[in-house]
Amino acid sequence: MKILLTGGCGFIGSNFVRFALGAGGDLSIVNLDALTYSGNPENLADLGDDNRYRFVKGDIRDLDLMAELIGECDAVVHMAAESHVDRSIIDARPFIQTNVLGTQTLLDALRRADPGNDKRFVHVSTDEVYGSLPLDRPDLLFTEDTPTDPKSPYAASKAASDFLVRAAVHTFGVNACITNCSNNFGPYQFPEKVIPLFVTNLIEGKKVPLYGDGLNVRDWLHVDDHCEAILAVLERGERGRTYNIGGNNERSNIDLTHQILAIMGFGDEMIQPVKDRPGHDRRYAIDAGRIERELGWTPSRSAWPLALRETIAWYKDNPQWWRRVKSGAYRAYYEQQYGSKA
């Protein structure tokens, strides 16, 4: 199987390339990435001589290029997206351009290149499209039937892209599935995200910026578990079906912070309280029962503290990667996002 992967130089995408190629079988990947701020070709630099892997620099809004690449491949895994909530609050326009217009362009290219609807299309999305759960109802979980209720510009853009994929399935018979995942963690994650942000700050002797009261809850999923689930959906998912992917690993932000501090040998004096994010969702929690029942997938790498310790160790062992990432424009963004909120 030859896969067109969009956004393969990002965090989840680059891990998917490594995981999929390492899984064995007759599989190759064409990685299409525009190399925006979080797309880092260094993530996959060591695969340059692997004949199962090819990189193409390009934009998913380029209809002709997308149709050409889809025509060469057997399936599409669509990960290319703007994904950071805080950036969407600052300026939502790139999120609309990439997540909404880009997804529609990709669907148009798929219809042009695959009029018989033979090629599988996996649209990788987020649990944030479901909105927020109350902290006082731990029994409530997001299921695939939970109404869509996005609360941030980022979540709204991803919800729109999900609806476009569903419309393409219903109207044109596109052979697509949608996945909605919880918060990912692992190696090669851009350090605007909370775990690599906190870990690299502490390595540099800086405090960690904790939003609000720290009681917001997220479900944490190791990126390799996520990649395994995406492969299962790609190979065995039902046309038009949505699959929630979670780690069964709910943690409050303050609990996450304390665990990172403890593993790295720091105390609460390294916490810098900052003004809360506007409209900060209180709790995300995934019911991943459907993918377990129908495709036989369950998370096996997401359990803490081991998975968190291994992730922290990766950032400790790879300072040359994240120090380059945290230079230049990132520092200006960090000051804008956290410096004025302390």
Regions found by a protein language model. Give the residues of each.
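N-terminal Rossmann-like NAD(P)+-binding domain of SDR-like oxidoreductases, especially those catalyzing
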Residues: 1-184, 315-318, 328-341
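Short, solvent-exposed loop/helix junctions and linker helices
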Residues: 6, 89, 97-100, 154, ...
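C-terminal substrate-binding subdomain of Rossmann-fold SDR/epimerase-dehydratase oxidoreductases
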Residues: 15-19, 23-24, 39, 58-61, ...
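A glycine/serine/threonine-rich, flexible loop-to-helix segment
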Residues: 47, 136-137, 191-199
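Residues in well-ordered alpha-helical elements
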Residues: 64-67, 86, 93, 104, ...
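Proline-centered helix-kink/hinge sites
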Residues: 92, 150-153, 181, 187, ...
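Structural element of the ATP-grasp superfamily
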Residues: 106, 165, 198, 291-292
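Hydrophobic alpha-helix immediately C-terminal to the catalytic Tyr-X-X-X-Lys motif of short-chain
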Residues: 160, 164, 168, 198, ...
